[in-house]
């Protein structure tokens, strides 16, 4: 029986980074898929601590909030930097990822038709900090922090991949980010995950917009 269980909707959403992390680290997990119809029936929501998914189970530990889950996996699997300095930087990067993910989600779910063009125009300014961070770490040839992968790398990779679908070519002016995506996506277990039917057949967002 896999030690981990992900309870979530049939879309990548807030769980694809943790799925990539688990796959890359050779961990197995169980998926409990919650359809929109099931969620709308209203029976599951009151049982969730914050009234939302994902729900994550690690043995007898149940967690909510996707970034708390990523941090838990980072600590338990050694993906949180090599020292406190790197851990602080990993937190900073992940918070930056979540800032942009929040903007992306607002546009996708609330203002796609009228807001997409303005969002894409502003995107370079949001991507630049990550290019800068890469340039400051071993010339951009390693990870976003230090010389070993962290949970923030998986979250950033997921964010960049969905933006490449939204705006193909968005990384053309960011050579370090472009190489970073190619490099991480080529890691054997991530490559296998990204080409798996489970990943390929899931719509990026619950409303079908991407």
UniProtKB/Swiss-Prot annotation:
Assembly information from the UniProt record: Homodimer.
Its biological purpose: Conjugation of reduced glutathione to a wide number of exogenous and endogenous hydrophobic electrophiles. Cannot metabolize 1-chloro-2,4-dinitrobenzene.
Top-level class of the enzyme under EC nomenclature: transferase
One matching Pfam family: GST_C_3
GO cellular component: cytosol
One MF annotation (Gene Ontology) recorded for this entry: glutathione transferase activity
Stated family: Belongs to the GST superfamily. Pi family.
Organism for this UniProt entry: Mus musculus (Mouse)
Gene, per the UniProt record: Gstp2
Name the UniProt record assigns to this protein: Glutathione S-transferase P 2
Keyword Lipid biosynthesis applies: no
Record key words, sorted: Transferase
Start and end residues of each GST N-terminal domain: 2-81
One GO-annotated biological process of the protein: glutathione metabolic process
Residue ranges of domain GST C-terminal in the record: 83-204
Protein EC: 2.5.1.18
Residues the record lists as binding glutathione: 8, 14, 39, 45, 52-53, 65-66
InterPro entries attached to this UniProt entry: Glutathione-S-Trfase_C-like, Glutathione-S-Trfase_C_sf, Glutathione_S-Trfase, Glutathione_S-Trfase_N, GST_C, GST_pi, GST_superfamily, Thioredoxin-like_sf
Lineage, highest ranks first: Eukaryota, Metazoa, Chordata, Craniata, Vertebrata
Record's keyword annotation contains Transferase: yes
Known tissue expression: Selectively expressed in gall bladder, colon, heart, and skeletal muscle.
Reactions performed catalytically: RX + glutathione = an S-substituted glutathione + a halide anion + H(+)
């Amino acid at each position: 029986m896999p030690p981990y269980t992900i309870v979530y909707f049939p879309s990548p959403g807030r769980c694809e980074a943790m799925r990539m992390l688990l796959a890359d680290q050779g961990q197995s997990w169980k998926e409990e898929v919650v359809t929109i119809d099931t969620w709308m029936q209203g029976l599951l929501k009151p049982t969730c601590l914050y009234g939302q998914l994902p729900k994550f189970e690690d043995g007898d530990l149940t967690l909510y909030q996707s970034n708390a889950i990523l941090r838990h996996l980072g600590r338990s699997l050694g993906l949180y930097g090599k020292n406190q300095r790197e851990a602080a930087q990993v937190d900073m990067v992940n918070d930056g990822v979540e800032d942009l993910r929040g903007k992306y989600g607002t546009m996708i779910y609330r203002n796609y038709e009228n807001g997409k063009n303005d969002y894409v125009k502003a995107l370079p300014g949001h991507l630049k900090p990550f290019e800068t961070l890469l340039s400051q770490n071993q010339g951009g040839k390693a990870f976003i922090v230090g010389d070993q992968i962290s949970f923030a790398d998986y979250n950033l990779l997921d964010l960049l991949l969905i933006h490449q679908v939204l705006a193909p070519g968005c990384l053309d002016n960011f050579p370090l980010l472009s190489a970073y995506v190619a490099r991480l996506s080529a890691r054997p277990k991530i490559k296998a995950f990204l080409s798996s039917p489970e990943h390929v057949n899931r719509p990026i967002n619950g409303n079908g917009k991407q």
